[in-house]
A protein has these predicted regions:
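Glycine/aspartate-rich loop-and-adjacent alpha/beta segment that forms the canonical ThDP
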Residues: 85-115
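Conserved thiamine diphosphate
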Residues: 34-86
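Glycine-rich anion/phosphate-binding loop at the beta-strand->alpha-helix junction
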Residues: 15, 24-38, 49
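Glycine-rich beta-alpha junction loops
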Residues: 23-25, 75, 98-104
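Structural motif
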Residues: 15-19, 58, 66-69, 92-94
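Thiamine diphosphate
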Residues: 1-27, 78-81
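Short acidic, glycine/serine/threonine-rich loops at helix termini
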Residues: 2-5, 28-33, 105-110
Length: 115
């Protein structure tokens, strides 16, 4: 949701901190795959994701973003330091926060899981 706006914000270097809580699913729609879902992930219904995930950091770099970082929600010390750096950056800052969804995406095969 909002990938088109993401691209335009980055390309125009709008001074904003763009934080993505990246868990690979749309939890409010009962766990549908997001654009960042791991290939091979399965919904509880058994449907498998056959698409490669979009790498938001890679996309931001490709679009010319001058501040790009990735962190993990379970590491608050690192996350806080990155958030402070992003807020002091002049221009677009993209922070991709891997944030596990324990309801719909908590399995050993997920890169966005506690398991």
């Amino acid at each position: 949701i909002g990938l088109g706006q993401f691209c335009h914000i980055v390309r125009r270097n709008i001074p904003i901190v763009y934080i993505v809580e990246n868990n690979g699913v749309y939890g409010l729609t009962k766990g549908q795959f997001s654009a960042t879902a791991d290939k091979g992930s399965k919904l509880k219904s058994g449907v498998q994701n056959d698409l490669q995930p979009i790498d938001l950091c890679g996309l931001a770099i490709e679009l010319g973003c001058s501040f790009v970082a990735r962190s993990f929600a379970g590491d608050p010390k690192q996350l806080m330091a990155l958030m402070k750096a992003a807020m002091s950056h002049k221009g677009t800052a993209v922070l991709d926060v891997i944030s596990p969804c324990v309801t719909f995406n908590n399995h050993e095969g997920s890169t966005k899981s506690y398991k």
